[in-house]
């Protein structure tokens, strides 16, 4: 497989975080993944579950758990920059649907 997606690098202190653009197939798998609900993991941020960050970045789940929300917000900004179409789709899905 050829790696042709966009990459955004973010420095969080001494940590170099690589935010990757995902393929359509990886995005579909990410949305389909439905682990047991965890309030903090699933709802701390509006558009990203904490468990999604290891897929979107080079961070391990252990590294994600050790970062404060302010640092994770910077990581998520990099993920948004690398995946604008995906986050645009999420925003469109949240809009109220017109009823006929």
Where are these regions (language model features)?
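Short, surface-exposed, charged amphipathic helix/loop patches that serve as local interaction elements
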Residues: 2-100
């Amino acid at each position: 497989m050829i790696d042709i997606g966009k990459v955004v690098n973010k420095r969080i202190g001494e940590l170099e975080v690589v935010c990757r653009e995902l393929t359509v197939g990886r995005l579909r798998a990410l949305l389909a993944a439905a682990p047991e609900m965890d309030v903090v993991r699933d709802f701390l941020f509006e558009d990203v579950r904490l468990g999604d960050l290891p897929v979107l970045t080079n961070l391990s789940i252990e590294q994600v758990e050790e970062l404060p929300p302010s640092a994770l917000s910077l990581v998520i900004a990099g993920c948004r920059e690398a995946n604008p179409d995906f986050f645009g789709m999420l925003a469109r899905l949240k809009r109220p649907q017109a009823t006929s």
